[in-house]
Swiss-Prot record:
The protein, known as: Flavin-dependent thymidylate synthase
NCBIfam families reported in the protein's UniProt record: thyX
Annotated Pfam families: Thy1
Subunit and interaction comment: Homotetramer.
Family: Belongs to the thymidylate synthase ThyX family.
Species assigned in the record: Mycobacterium sp. (strain JLS)
């Protein structure tokens, strides 16, 4: 029986920043948040912080978001390793073109023992989960049978290991066509702060697919821990159905 995979979002990289020694400026933040402030001040050479209302890093970053000077957010980035996400969800995720992606390859990695992600609309309903599991098991059995027969057909009597590797890849790329959209995949996603804000604004909405909304909320919680001055304006709150959304009163992009 197919095992289910829970969503997991792991922070694996973030921006570091070093102030140039010849610039007479310091701030009360570090990493990406400091870099964003530095980039903004570099536009105007305002190293002396002439405006007391934007003297702190948090107040400066809030101001640039309020006025829509979002290009400076592009200098800092965060990378996540995301597991327990379905193929159907990553098909939506990769539509965000300002992210960079490296995803598990079904051509190189056999899916005989792959896990599945239960759609939120099915989750918790015993009857629906039974139907879902049966369908997932049937597709995986068909995959295994197709893979075995394709490998036997394509390998033939070719002795060379290089050709054998190619034939196995060709067998997997054909057999994977019967795997369900619910098949778990794993993906590294890197994006700058501006791209992450856009993703959260679009996908943490009530109108987004629930699986990718859960992903957006999970990413947001990690992002707030990394750069609160950039992401803490998003408020997470529950809906009547128990699911969560996130909204912000500040500038976002459609």
């Amino acid at each position: 029986m197919a095992e289910t995979a829970p969503l997991r979002v792991q922070l694996i990289a973030r921006t570091e920043f070093t102030v140039p020694p010849d610039v007479p400026w310091e701030t009360d933040a570090e990493g990406g948040a400091a870099l964003v402030e530095f980039a903004g001040r570099a536009c105007y050479q305002s190293w002396s912080k002439p405006n007391p209302r934007t003297a702190t890093n948090a107040s400066y970053l809030r101001h640039i978001i309020e006025v829509g000077h979002l290009s400076v957010l592009e200098h800092a980035s965060v990378s996540f390793y995301i597991t327990g996400i379905s193929r159907s969800c990553t098909h939506e995720l990769i539509r965000h073109r300002h992210f960079s992606y490296s995803q598990l390859s079904q051509r190189y990695v056999p899916e005989n023992d792959s896990q599945v992600v239960v759609p939120p609309g099915i989750e918790g309903d015993a009857e629906l989960e039974g139907l879902f599991t049966a369908a997932a098991d049937a597709s995986r059995a068909a995959y295994a049978e197709l893979l075995a027969k394709l490998e036997a057909k394509l390998m033939g009597d070719e002795p060379r290991e290089g050709r054998a590797t190619l034939r196995r890849k060709q067998a997997r790329q054909a057999a994977r066509s019967v795997l369900p959209n619910a098949t778990e995949t794993r993906i590294v996603v890197t994006g700058n702060y501006r791209a992450w804000r856009h993703f959260i604004a679009m996908r943490a909405s009530e109108h987004a697919d629930l699986e990718i909304r859960r992903l957006a909320i999970a990413c947001l919680r990690e992002l707030v821990a990394v750069a609160p001055a950039v992401f803490a304006d998003f408020e997470i709150y529950p809906l009547a159905d128990g699911t969560e959304v996130a909204t912000t009163p500040l500038v976002t992009e459609a």
